[in-house]
Amino acid sequence: MPFHKNHLMYALLLVISLSIIIPVLFNGGALRDRLSEKTAKALVLSCIDFRFVNDKVSFFNSIGFRDDYNKFSLAGASLGYNQTQFPEWRETCNKHIELAMQLHDINEVIVMDHMDCGAYRILYDSPSMSRQEEYELHKKNLNKFKTMINQKFPALTVTTHLMDVDGSVMS
């Protein structure tokens, strides 16, 4: 039987596939170990704004949370939780916190707001609020969020952060 390039390609694919599948099937390899972990450090609540995704990941990696937190998003983050126009947002967030406690044994809730937040302009009906006005509203909402979560989930630590438009964390 003559040798074909296809035989070599199939053999190579088989070897590569088996080298990936066998360790997973026999409880070896990093993937199996990672999938068996049942804990996470925290649930992180942040805004839905796509502009800050990479900056948030970089920040959480830098403080030791790489691949070690549950992610939850609400428009406005702390404001999304505190506002009254959509009360189901708060209840949904609370249910996710409860679930993260049960599934992943979290011991912390972290909320990260960001400056230049469209949800703040819309929910406060203030399209031209100043940077200082927005900053003060963030601080107010972050503090209110912390108080409310501490009351509802006293066993959890609550940490608040505010990201600036350049990706730096202000607090």
Predicted regions and their residues:
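N-terminal secretory signal peptides that target proteins for export/translocation
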Residues: 1-3
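Divalent-metal-activated hydrolytic enzyme cores
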Residues: 6-56, 75-92, 99-104, 108, ...
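Short Gly/aromatic-enriched secondary-structure transition segments
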Residues: 57-64
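A generic structural signal for alpha->beta connector loops
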Residues: 65-68, 155-157
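A short beta-strand-loop structural module common to alpha/beta enzyme folds
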Residues: 67-77
